[in-house]
Amino acid sequence: VSVKLVDGKNGIITANDVLANIQAPLDWLPKTSLVCLENTHNKGGGACYELDNLKEIRKVCIQNNLKLHIDGARIWNALVAKKYSPFDIGQQCDSISVCFSKGLGAPVGSAIIGDFSFIKKARRVRKAFGGGMRQVGILGAACIYAIDNNLQKLELDHQHANEIANCLWEKDWVKSILPVETNMIIFEVDEQKTSVLQILDLLKEKNILAVQFGPKQIRLVFHLDIKPEMIPILKSKMDEIIISKQ
């Protein structure tokens, strides 16, 4: 298996990007057979694919006999942000993986979706690697509950992310912020004034947990357990972070 990474804007690629990266049919080159997209894109700050873009990529895949898979661990956020239906996205790909625990708040659970022959092959591969669980109905019930009850709550997570991003823009220790489309904020720390580790420590002192996301960036993710009444508190705690240049 050979993998070819494609640079995109905040992780989002286009049909032209796919075309430009299809290998020539030469004996000494790996054959291009699969296109994988991530929607929403984690390192792109939760960026979403537009439906028209997906349709164009799908068209290129069909014309070049390529399969299209979507890593949809956070697909629910994309559906809510863009107001698409699951069918809008599902019709554009051969397979898609989804997660029920990230945004939807189920305790555990992911699924892979495809046609009958694909799922049959996936089950065979899972078994070959020792995978499989018994009596998982109770976990499945939690996933169904999450879809039925928590899907529309994702919009609130998106609102919270935008609100805190606006707050962060006012901080002199923030150099830049990726565009906020869903429930994530990825911001770059101004290293002329402070460091990622110092900001993480100061946030932790105020019971705000964040993660380092590369050498200069920090990621914040908003989820089901962050309530509206917590946002003003979060803002005030961030306002308390004052960096004194040594």
Write out the residue ranges for each language-model feature.
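Conserved PLP-enzyme active-site core in the AAT-like
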Residues: 1-193, 197-201, 206, 211-217, ...
